[in-house]
Amino acid sequence: MRSQKKGPFIDTHVLAKIEDMNNRNEKKVVRTWSRRSTIIPEMVGHTLAVHNGKKFIPVYVTENMVGHKLGEFSFTRQFKGHSVKAATETAAKPAR
């Protein structure tokens, strides 16, 4: 939790790119490694490609995301699912 008087943290290079695009009325994808940056209202409507450690995941920013971190929307781990064999064994066991 960050102090209220400090304000939200956002890397300066990300903020500069967003402000520049807002001034030009452009909507381009911004590639960033800054998962720690907080989403601010100026980012709404933009798409940021956030690095997950392997590749860039496109994140379209909506109003509901304001106040969250960019890294929350670019998952670093992929859930492959439980094995089908284990799921069928537990379903086939009779209840005691």
Swiss-Prot record:
PROSITE patterns from the UniProt entry: RIBOSOMAL_S19
Biological processes, Gene Ontology terms: ribosomal small subunit assembly; translation
Protein keywords: Ribonucleoprotein, Ribosomal protein, RNA-binding, rRNA-binding
GO CC list: cytoplasm; small ribosomal subunit
Keyword rRNA-binding attributed: yes
Stated family: Belongs to the universal ribosomal protein uS19 family.
Function in brief: Protein S19 forms a complex with S13 that binds strongly to the 16S ribosomal RNA.
UniProt protein name: Small ribosomal subunit protein uS19
Protein species of origin: Koribacter versatilis (strain Ellin345)
Name of the gene: rpsS
